[in-house]
From Swiss-Prot:
PROSITE patterns: HISTONE_LIKE. GO terms for biological process: DNA recombination; positive regulation of metabolic process; regulation of DNA-templated transcription; regulation of translation. Keywords: DNA recombination, DNA-binding, Transcription, Transcription regulation, Translation regulation. The keyword Amino-acid biosynthesis does not apply. The lineage of its organism: Bacteria, Pseudomonadati, Pseudomonadota, Alphaproteobacteria, Hyphomicrobiales. This is Integration host factor subunit alpha. One of its GO terms (cellular component) is cytosol. SUPFAM superfamilies: IHF-like DNA-binding proteins. It holds the Pfam family Bac_DNA_binding. This protein is one of the two subunits of integration host factor, a specific DNA-binding protein that functions in genetic recombination as well as in transcriptional and translational control. One of its GO terms (molecular function) is structural constituent of chromatin.
Length: 108
């Protein structure tokens, strides 16, 4: 799947091929996992996936920004943002490195 954007359908197909569920069950599983992640994030919880990373909801306070075209100051309201922080294992795998003596390029 490298070199392209991976979609829900791609994830469902991977589950279908690797786990052996039906295509419908694979799609339902992917949707259930994504829905649970969304529900947790919506309620302000952190979602931590071991060896992958964490999805964290952060609060940004009110601040003064500037319109880049006009230079006029604008008040930016407080808001919630979602941030993904990759694990060291994922970072090493992306960079072709090793973690704790494991070759992250090999299939696990």
């Amino acid at each position: 799947m490298a070199g392209k954007t991976v979609t829900r359908a791609d994830l469902s197909e991977a589950v279908y091929q690797q786990v052996g569920l039906s295509r419908a069950e694979s799609a339902a599983l992917v949707e259930t996992v994504l829905a649970e992640i969304c529900t947790c994030l919506s309620s302000g919880e952190t979602v931590k996936l071991s060896s992958f990373g964490s999805f964290v909801v952060r609060s940004k306070g009110k601040r003064i920004g500037r319109n880049p075209k006009t230079g006029v100051e604008v008040e930016i309201e407080p808001r919630q943002v979602m941030v993904f922080k990759p694990s060291n294992v994922l970072k090493a795998r992306i960079n072709g490195g090793h973690v704790n003596g494991l070759d992250m390029d090999e299939d696990e």
